[in-house]
Amino acid sequence: RCGVCEKVCPTGAIRFDQEDRIISENVGAIVVTTGFNVLNTDFFPEYGYGKYKDIITGIQFERLASASGPTLGEIRRPSDGKIPQKIVFVACAGSRDPAKGIPYCSKICCMYTAKHAMLYQHKVHNGESYVFYMDIRAGGKNYEEFVRRAIEEDGVNYIRGRVARIYEKNGKLIVKGVDTLLGASPVEIEADMVVLATAGVANKGAEDLAQK
């Protein structure tokens, strides 16, 4: 190491000769950031993840959209490398589902799904994107405006309702759900790709750590 950063640091925060020491402080509370995991996709077999190659998770879509990802930022289907002309995003994939033991909202899914849908529209200009959601929970500064931008400026189609089943037919993914804003009317979309916004769950060991 050259040590230049230590010399030029205006606050003296860099010290290469500093030794380990134990510090004791009296505090009012301790916040431990344990992180989280995403829900195992085997949790909802009705969505067909693992059975159909073109059903992926939000994390996998993030890699596809990244310039350093496997497709160099191009949105392409895992099955054949073609650009999907119609894509469905399923928010709350596992979240807010008391029947399966996850009654809570994962909080992050609404926003990263909106971002993913916008990225898709920016990269596939003639493509169609649909988002199935339960409620829009945009809990942050300018978050609501961000979602409205996805809808009004980028043309993302939002459908308020749950997806009941996804299956493949004649090379297309059939997404069956309902639109609760239209009186729970059945909705069926033929998609080229489906992205699941899987629920966030507590990190392994977090409960044990809380007892210590």
Per-range role (PLM):
Residues 1-212:
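Residues forming the flavin
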